[in-house]
């Protein structure tokens, strides 16, 4: 958000460096955190959740086992309805199903960033920053969740927006998309027409 708002690169560099330093200190001072990171980096098979997710995705192949045909979700894969929903999709719908999900997210994010760009062109800086923040949050959460499921990142408990089970996750995702649609509506209509909606 600081980068989009036009902050100086030195200020942004200081904030990012301080954040990375604090995270690094937190990891080094707690043996549990350090073990989780080092065990993941040395051998992903030691992380049960990641290993079971990869087994499920490999079992799915190109076309999957069919809806309801996956077996990893039955006590083998921890939290299949929340953190590891992408692995369940990979097992039951295959690589093609995972690609469909990725393309759907790419379409939503592309539209969202376009809404932010249009709002900025119309002179609505605050609305543009809000839209950009929502899209960036979605993109980061999607990236981390899919990275966890594919074994590229250690498990962290991030849900997959609009797909993972969980009341607060779904509610916040829907509210965020509603705000995004409101920004789009305000950017496309004049002030007089906006007053008619109220």
Question: Model-predicted segments: where are they?
Answer:
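Hydrophobic transmembrane alpha-helices and their immediate junctions
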Residues: 96-140
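Alpha-helical transmembrane bundle and helix-membrane interface signal
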Residues: 1-32, 114-123, 180-194
């Amino acid at each position: 958000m600081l980068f989009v708002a036009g902050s100086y690169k030195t200020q942004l560099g200081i904030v990012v460096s301080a954040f990375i330093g604090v995270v690094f200190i937190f990891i080094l001072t707690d043996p549990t955190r350090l073990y989780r990171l080092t065990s993941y980096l040395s051998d992903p098979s030691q992380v049960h959740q990641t290993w079971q997710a990869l087994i499920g995705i490999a079992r799915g192949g190109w076309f999957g086992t069919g809806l309801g045909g996956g077996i990893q979700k039955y006590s083998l894969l921890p939290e299949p309805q929340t953190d590891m929903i992408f692995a369940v999709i990979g097992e039951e719908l295959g690589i093609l199903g995972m690609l469909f999900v990725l393309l759907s997210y790419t379409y939503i994010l592309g539209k969202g960033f376009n809404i932010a760009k249009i709002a900025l062109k119309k002179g609505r800086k605050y609305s543009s920053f809000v839209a950009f923040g929502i899209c960036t949050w979605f993109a980061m959460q999607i990236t981390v969740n899919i990275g966890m499921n594919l074994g590229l990142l250690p498990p962290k408990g991030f849900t997959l927006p609009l797909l993972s089970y969980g009341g607060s996750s779904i509610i916040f995702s829907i509210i965020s998309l509603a705000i995004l649609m409101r920004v789009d509506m305000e950017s496309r209509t004049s002030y007089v027409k906006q007053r008619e909606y109220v």
